[in-house]
């Protein structure tokens, strides 16, 4: 705010009158404030129509996406959130940065204290991790980035200074990053809320728990398990044994 990058004054005007989508015109404000104001309206619209979307345009300092999708799962709603950002990532097969790290988050209620939630960048690694490698003067693993000439590089400084990160999964990650740029333009965020019961999924909670338990029973690690478990432990909350996030 000191550098006038973020506008501190004014409210969060809502543009449009329909439930899908419902855009917030941010004017360079902090996104968490707008999402806090918009999530109750989004949840109400999703319960009424079965599906609703909140678009926050021209936003800054988004931070993590998981708190927003988790907040919706705590109300019995499924949620999908995405946002583009500044250009840091080259498209698969490309030679220069074009995409943001374009995180994608998803949440689904399971009927207990621990919903299924994930939040990850569509780059092979978060940009902040590259910064840590540079600070520690450590070489990057192969496949994380390219230099300003489009050549593979293990030098964190070369990747950050004129180079680019790479998308995860090659063309698949690149396609998801493209989707995010198309669905959530204007440097904004898109949050979609879903009422599972609106689509005939009356017993969706037990089905969800059974599916996630079947994954864990094979010894596979579910996304965000250890993080959720640590959060539950630190706050004294209980993560049920049937929860997909109860064990690391």
What are these regions (language model features)?
Residues 1-43:
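Active-site cofactor/substrate anionic-group-binding motifs, chiefly glycine-
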Residues 17-20, 48-52, 74-78, 100-103, ...:
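Short coil/turn connectors at secondary-structure junctions
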Residues 135-187:
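Secondary-shell segments that build the walls of catalytic and ion/ligand-binding clefts
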Residues 57, 80-83, 107-109, 118-121, ...:
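Short beta-strand segments
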């Amino acid at each position: 705010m000191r550098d006038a990058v973020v506008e501190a004054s004014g409210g969060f005007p809502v543009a449009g009158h329909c439930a899908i989508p419902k855009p917030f015109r941010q004017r360079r404000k902090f996104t968490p404030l707008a999402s806090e104001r918009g999530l109750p309206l989004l949840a109400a619209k999703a319960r009424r129509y079965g599906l609703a979307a909140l678009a926050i345009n021209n936003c800054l300092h988004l931070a993590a996406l998981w708190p927003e999708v988790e907040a919706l799962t705590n109300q019995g709603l499924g949620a999908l959130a995405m946002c583009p950002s500044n250009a840091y990532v080259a498209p698969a097969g490309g030679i220069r940065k074009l995409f943001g790290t374009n995180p994608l988050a998803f949440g689904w209620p399971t009927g207990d204290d621990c919903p299924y939630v994930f939040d990850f960048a569509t780059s092979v690694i978060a940009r902040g991790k590259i910064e840590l490698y540079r600070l520690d003067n450590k070489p990057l693993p192969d496949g994380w980035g390219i230099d300003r000439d489009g050549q593979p590089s293990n030098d964190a400084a070369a990747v950050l200074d004129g180079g680019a990160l790479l998308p995860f999964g090659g063309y698949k990650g690149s396609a998801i990053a493209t989707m995010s740029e198309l669905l959530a333009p204007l440097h904004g965020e898109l949050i979609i809320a879903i009422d599972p019961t609106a689509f005939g999924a009356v017993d969706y909670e037990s089905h969800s728990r059974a599916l996630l338990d079947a994954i864990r029973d094979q010894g596979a690690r579910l996304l965000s398990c250890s993080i959720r478990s640590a959060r539950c432990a630190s706050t004294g909350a209980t993560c049920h044994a049937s929860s997909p996030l109860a064990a690391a």
